[in-house]
């Protein structure tokens, strides 16, 4: 009897020691969230005389919260110029300390927090990107970013990156970005951004600077997004400049149907961004039919709006392009000064 009692006491003591060494919890570890999207398209190009159907893109995203941090990664396989390629489109480790949650620190590859347009189709309201998005500003950074929320209406951010749209640094310098974002009204968001750094291969000279401003207005049935990008690059005695502006408007006509229009202008008088001195203009208009709402995730809304990303969206658009200098190459290799394109795009978010 005495030995049994001693054994029970020893077992109890051992269990208490084990409990002190390893905390007991009944909470389940947060699962890895898997989401993504797929894009199918039909394109018509008047200048080349081509009509093409394509399974254009598929992206798979992983999201994993770990304490005060989270990991977000996205692998994207896209078809471009007839060839498919897979890349790490986003890979971000972000940490927000619970004792100072107005701060957040991120590291990896991420969308440049500039302007209204994004490179992923579900995050846009129209199925083509503007000349301004393509030429006037960076779309991706690889580096680190810091965000500080001063108040619910004011946020500041800073980025140190390898450069404009490069995964590996192409020179010894780094590109710096600062951004201030202000919400004066609950339906208005204004952002001001500055970017500075060397961008040419194997050279720390020719510093490139960019001033960018973007405005988003969300009035429920009407969403307007506009951006202005003014850039300059230092060069011996020339200092070429460029200016890109774009404005997009979306009107919700019914519960499931909307209409989008965009005007875009890219002025490149020195040809530093487009290859030849020119002014590019485009007008794009088209309807969107959307059904159901995608599940909640790291990207659940069009940025700075209450427009919830639909699970299924069918979008059509007619786009007219003009250039002050022949720029659009036809099937015979001759440049033309104008072009017309038609697009039918299906986007499915899972």
Q: Where do the PLM segments sit?
A:
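Bacterial N-terminal signal peptides that target proteins for export
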Residues: 1-5
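Hydrophobic alpha-helical segments of integral membrane proteins
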Residues: 8-16, 93, 321
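N-terminal periplasmic/intermembrane-space "pro-region" immediately following the signal or transit peptide
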Residues: 10-12, 17-44, 295-302, 345, ...
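Outer membrane beta-barrel
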Residues: 21-163, 172-176, 181-190, 248-260, ...
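Outer-membrane beta-barrel pore domains
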Residues: 44-48, 92-94, 118, 188-350
């Amino acid at each position: 009897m005495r030995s049994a009692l001693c054994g029970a006491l020893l077992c109890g003591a051992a269990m208490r020691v084990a409990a002190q060494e390893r905390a007991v919890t009944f909470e389940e570890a947060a699962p890895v969230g898997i989401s993504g999207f797929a894009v199918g398209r039909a394109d018509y190009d008047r200048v080349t005389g081509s009509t093409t159907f394509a399974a254009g893109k598929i992206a798979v995203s992983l999201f994993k919260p770990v304490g005060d941090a989270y990991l977000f990664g996205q692998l994207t396989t896209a078809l471009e110029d007839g060839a498919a390629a897979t890349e790490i489109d986003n890979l971000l480790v972000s940490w927000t300390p619970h004792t100072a949650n107005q701060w957040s620190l991120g590291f990896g590859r991420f969308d440049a927090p500039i302007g209204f347009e994004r490179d992923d189709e579900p995050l846009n309201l129209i199925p083509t990107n503007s000349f301004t998005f393509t030429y006037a500003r960076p779309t991706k950074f690889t580096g680190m970013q810091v965000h500080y929320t001063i108040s619910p209406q004011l946020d500041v951010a800073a980025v140190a990156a390898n450069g404009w749209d490069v995964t590996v640094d192409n020179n010894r310098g780094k590109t710096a970005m600062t951004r201030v974002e202000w919400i004066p009204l609950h339906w208005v968001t204004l952002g001001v951004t500055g970017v500075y750094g060397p961008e040419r291969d194997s050279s720390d000279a020719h510093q490139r600077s960019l001033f960018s401003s973007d405005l988003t207005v969300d009035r429920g049935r009407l969403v307007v997004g506009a951006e202005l990008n003014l850039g300059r690059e230092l060069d011996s005695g020339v200092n070429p400049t460029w200016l890109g502006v774009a404005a997009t408007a979306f009107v919700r006509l019914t519960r499931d149907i909307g209409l989008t229009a965009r005007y875009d202008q890219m002025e490149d008088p020195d040809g530093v961004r487009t290859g030849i001195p020119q002014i590019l203009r485009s007008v794009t208009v088209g309807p969107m039919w959307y059904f159901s709402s995608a599940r909640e995730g790291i990207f659940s809304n069009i940025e700075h709006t209450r427009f919830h990303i639909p699970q299924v969206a069918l979008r059509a658009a007619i786009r007219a392009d003009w250039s002050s200098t022949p720029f659009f190459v036809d099937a015979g290799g001759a440049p033309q000064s104008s072009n017309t394109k038609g697009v039918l795009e299906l986007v499915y978010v899972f």
